[in-house]
Amino acid sequence: MLEIKTLEKADERRDFPRGHLEAVHLSGLDFAVATFEPGWRWTESVAPIAGTESCQIHHHCYVVQGRMRIRMDDGAESEVGPGDVFVCSPGHDAWVVGDEQTVVYDFAGPMATGYAKAD
């Protein structure tokens, strides 16, 4: 089997305050590209849509551009930037650092299937 899709014709796009997500769905892979503008913060932009106090999505990500700070519910905190690959468990907040747009590729299905999606 060979299956190919392009983000130029994403299966879906979700807009949220100060950002958006584009997703493609393939057999065995749901892939998302999230774009966050300066000033974006999960608790302000997505929490009202998700209805939770912190992000409950599991992420497997690669940062294409920009910087983002992530704070876990247990207080652990770190910053990611271009070229970083990271895994982030449910239960976190995140925000753009600086005045550059942040672009993240997420290979974990839940981001592509449920992130910033109203019920």
Where are these regions (language model features)?
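Double-stranded beta-helix
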Residues: 3-9, 14, 95-119
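Short acidic-glycine-tyrosine-enriched beta hairpin
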Residues: 72-92
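Conserved GNAT-family N-acetyltransferase fold
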Residues: 34-36, 61, 86
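A short, N-terminal "cap"/entry segment at the start of jelly-roll beta-barrel domains
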Residues: 1-35, 43, 119
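Glycine- and acidic-residue-biased ligand/ion/polar-headgroup-sensing regions
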Residues: 29, 48-74
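Short beta-strand segments
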Residues: 32, 76-78, 103
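Short beta-strand segments in beta-sandwich/barrel cores
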Residues: 41-42, 66-71, 94
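Conserved short histidine dyad/triad with adjacent acidic residue
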Residues: 33-54
